[in-house]
Amino acid sequence: MRFIPGLLLSAALLTAAPLAFAEERTAFELQAREIYQTVVEIRSAKGQGNVPVVVDYIVRELKAGGFADADIEVTDYEIEDELVQGLMVWYRAEGTPKQKPIVLLAHMDVVDALPDTWTRYPFELIEENGYFFGRGTADNKYGVTSLVATFLRLKAEGFKPDRDLVMILSGDEETGMISTRAQAKYTDEKIKPAYVLNADAGGLSLDENGKPLLYGVQGAEKTYATFELTVSNPGGHSSTPRVDNAIYELADALKKIEAYKFPVMHSPLTLASFKSAGAQTPGPLGEAMLAFAKNPADEAAIAALRANPETVGSTGTTCIATMLRAGHAENALPQRATATINCRIFPGVGIAATEQTLKEVVGNDGVTFKLISDLVESPESNLPDEVMAAIAKALAARGLEGLPILPHMSSGGTDGLFYRNLGYDTLGIDGSGAKPNDTFAHGLNERLSVDSFFGGLDHWYIVLKDLAGAE
């Protein structure tokens, strides 16, 4: 799941900057496009059994590009009777490593797409009107392509890093994250990196005209937690209604949750985000960002930020009803009514404390709570100076020297949360960028601009050469 600077853009909006469109593509660019097309056209959604197909293709490309069998590890996971695989690839240091390894993340799976609801077939890479269309073009097949193509490019050029670079591609980030958990555990036990860099978050934020506004570094993620709230009742015949009713009782609980506002929260990272984003955002919203950054108790600023879907998540915990099911027949009183509540919890609050708050808000012991998610909590990451300097170098190479680099917190979760939970600074620093509401990740007609695709390919190349000992 892609997450980019949430103060200006919602999740999954950023994909590489539209710099000059090259008439002639380099061999590297053409190779990257071929990789992109191949992985996008593999339907690697849950239930399709195709993640191993993606793995097989990438492994063949890497071996053809000079990576040895010993550099590649494929791991198998059986998830709900489906074989899912993860992939780890080592670009090993020349001789004795001079520094701790760097781990690089992306995910090979996608949210499924129903072909009959799309304007174009979602599992064919279609280039049209300056865009690449297809499921995963933004989330996260571009991240996969960028890392794989960069490894191949560096290997072809004979680059010899002074530290190990370890590319870790998960196979079920969009669902249970079983492969993610196992890979994070392995990383902690065997690799012990200096830090982790994620290609599924971060990137350039562009205005409506395509002008870069800032580069976002994802340094934190809110904790994901989903609860089921259930009311049970003896039920009966609808012609003899009871005074109590499971649906009405659940509805009362939901209305209380709707009315409740979690406390306003902030951190140095979110205040810095609001300050930087506010300077780039025109009108009342930008003014509210700046006011909140200056004084997080400013009630007018809080009201403005919480009224905007793009900024409310950065002001505290949110819990929202997302699903309902109740009853078993149209002429029977409901014996059970269940609602699903999805929470995005501000770092440091915790899942248990959030559940307790919801119970107090509902104030009805007849409403039972069940936590149905099992994701971990993760702290904010530090921002290593060498990573920030490498990003600045990559931006300068793209003609964006001096562009503000903004740390931010994502309202959703990526593979990175498991690495943060284990104590590793994990930064989303993809080379992508897009205008607001322009990629439709997880939605219909997902796309990424062609200029964006090619404009961001050098990003990881420059960053990794800088961090791993450019020659």
Residue map of PLM features:
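A non-catalytic alpha/beta surface segment that caps or lines the substrate-entry region
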Residues: 45-99, 123-126
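N-terminal signal peptide c-region/cleavage motif recognized by signal peptidases
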Residues: 16-17
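Active-site metal-coordination/substrate-binding segment of hydrolases
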Residues: 97-169
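N-terminal hydrophobic or amphipathic helices/low-complexity stretches enriched
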Residues: 21-49, 63-68, 114-117, 221-224
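Histidine/acidic-residue-rich, glycine-tolerant segments that coordinate divalent metal ions
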Residues: 162-246
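An extended, acidic, His-containing surface patch that forms the Zn2+-binding/catalytic region
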Residues: 80, 97-99, 204-206, 263-328, ...
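Cleavable N-terminal signal peptides
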Residues: 9-10, 20
